[in-house]
Structure formats: structure tokens, C-alpha cells
Amino acid sequence: MKTIVVCSGGLDSVSLAHRTASEEQLIGLVSFDYGQRHRKELDFAAKCAARLAVPHHIIDIAAIGGHLSGSALTDNVEVPDGHYAEETMKATVVPNRNAIMLAIAFGLAAAQKADAVAVAVHGGDHFIYPDCRPGFIDAFQRMQNEALDGYASVKLLAPYVEVSKAAIVADGTRHGTPFAETWSCYKGGSLHCGRCGTCVERREAFHLAGVSDPTEYEDRDFWKAAASQYSAAEVR
């Protein structure tokens, strides 16, 4: 299938891009600038597109993001430290982010006569992000079937929606993902902080997958204390 991958430049979506390039006909990556403080992730998405020799579309929706106030990712709100399974991580929710991005990606796919859009939502996101859950994925597909009826037929591929980030690390390893060329940290500093939810989850995923983590962290060991109160099953 001719497939466009929604790629932020993070570990999950870059791994998905490499997987898609090996299993489908990857025809491009689409990324979004929504005013996120960690905009540097887009540079890693660009590197991925160049590596896989496909077009890279960066869609500027910062004006929209500016109205979705109250998130630590876009506003002057401190990014909390700790595990994603903690209630405090709800500060990182950008309301309706995936719905907005996927609607645009589906429009792009229809215009380019693509067969599918692939997105890297995964099981570890379910606790905090409602637009990463299977119910949302299924509902969005039904909505797009109606929205594009008679014009295009585009499938939503979400192969990681029921699996852990550790499983994505394992999958990325199989498909040759260069993990050092991905960016996760929400704080957007020169190095991964090692303390925010996405850094803790990233560090923990490599550990659980038994794969060496090439990432440079400002605090390489914080994840141990943050993750110690949760079982592997709880952080799916």
C-alpha cells in the first residue's frame, strides 16, 4: 500500500517509518509544527525522510496550537518529571492533537492518492492520552470513511496501538532504526533530560527490550526510581 507516515521525529514514529519502508510503499512523511517547545524533533523527522529517500512535509499548525492552551508542551507550563503512568503527566495533553493532525494527514493522503496513513500511537500512551487509544483509532477510521466517501479510500494503520514502547524498540531494532537519530524529550534541551515522562519511558523501554540505549541523557539514572513503582504490565 502507498503509505504516508505521521512522523514527529521521535523513537516511535521513526521506527514506524522504517517498518513501513520495509513492508509497504512509503511515499512520504508528514510532520506538524504545533508550537511545541521540543520543535527540534522535526529535525530528526527530516533526517529520517532523507535517510529513507522520501518527501517530508512539515505542516505549520502553530496558530491552531496556540489556541489549545494549558499544555506543558505548548504553553509556559513546566514539563513534569516522572513516569507517564502518573496523574501529573496530564499536563502534557494537547487537546485533540492527534485528531487534528490525522485529519490533515488524511487530506494529504487523499490528495496524493495514497492508500494509508500510519501513526505510531502505542499502548503506553493509553493512560494519559485518549487520542492514542484503540477506541479513538477505530472511531477516526469510521469518521474518515464518511468524510472521504466517494472520493478516496484511506486506511489508518496503527500497528503499535496495543503494544508497549519496549516492543517498539524491539521492532525498530529489527528494521534498522538508528535510535540515536530520534528525539523524545519534551523539554527540548541540548540533550534528553532523562527526567520527563517521555525520557523515563524511553530509557525504560530500552531496558525492558534488552537493547543498548545510545541516547545521551542529562540524568541517566532517574528513570529507575520513577519506574520502580510500576510493573511492566502497568506501563504497556
Swiss-Prot record:
GO terms for molecular function: ATP binding; ligase activity, forming carbon-nitrogen bonds; zinc ion binding. Its cofactor is Zn(2+). The keyword Protein biosynthesis does not apply. It comes from the Bacteria. Its EC number is 6.3.4.20. Pfam families: QueC. ATP binds at C7, S8, G9, G10, L11, D12, S13, V14, S15, L16, A17. Keywords: ATP-binding, Ligase, Metal-binding, Nucleotide-binding, Queuosine biosynthesis, Zinc. Zn(2+) binds at C185, C193, C196, C199. InterPro entries: QueC (IPR018317), Rossmann-like_a/b/a_fold (IPR014729). Disulfide bonds: none annotated. SUPFAM superfamilies: Adenine nucleotide alpha hydrolases-like (SSF52402). It is an enzyme of class 6 (ligase). Binds 1 zinc ion per subunit. GO terms for biological process: queuosine biosynthetic process. Pathway: Purine metabolism; 7-cyano-7-deazaguanine biosynthesis. It catalyses: 7-carboxy-7-deazaguanine + NH4(+) + ATP = 7-cyano-7-deazaguanine + ADP + phosphate + H2O + H(+). Belongs to the QueC family. PANTHER family: 7-CYANO-7-DEAZAGUANINE SYNTHASE. Catalyzes the ATP-dependent conversion of 7-carboxy-7-deazaguanine (CDG) to 7-cyano-7-deazaguanine (preQ(0)). This is 7-cyano-7-deazaguanine synthase. It comes from Rhizobium etli (strain ATCC 51251 / DSM 11541 / JCM 21823 / NBRC 15573 / CFN 42).
